Amino acid sequence: VHTPNIHTIEEICEFLHTPLEKSCKAVVYQKNLTDDYVVVFIRGDLDVNETKLTNFLGEEIHPAVITKECGLNAGYIGPVNLTVAGSYTVVYDRSLQGTNNLSCGANEEEYHYTGLCMERDIPNARYIDVAKILDGGICPKCGKKTIGISRGIEVGNIFQLGTKYTKSMNMQYL
């Protein structure tokens, strides 16, 4: 689909009249030590948890500097036929697993794909959890329970209390 002057996931969804959760966006980082690119594909309504991504990669990252030389077109990056100059890593967030009919970048300036089916179009994708947790979201461990986020009253003290309070408040650490 020709999408002139559209660069953000919000703009593309408005242009195509689709909700954010039916889109696949790319977030690009670089590894601190090597400057190799890391391209993260995640559902359009979610954000990347950089701590989870750093833990998965085993090294620190920073937001990428995208230039024409690297082969990426900011605002038009997609998982189909992705090519990046040099060494790079592609990460697919678990939120995309089993999804279809998504919109995404076509890796060509001013163009986007519609109808992306992850299992058909990216059959060998390996999915990991790198999304930020949302209040009311689905549990990334079991996929069933919804998550409730509450404000804490104290952060910074460490006590050897075991599970005394977490059990009494029916809380679970993910």
Where are these regions (language model features)?
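Extended, low-hydrophobicity, polar/charged segments
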Residues: V1-L174
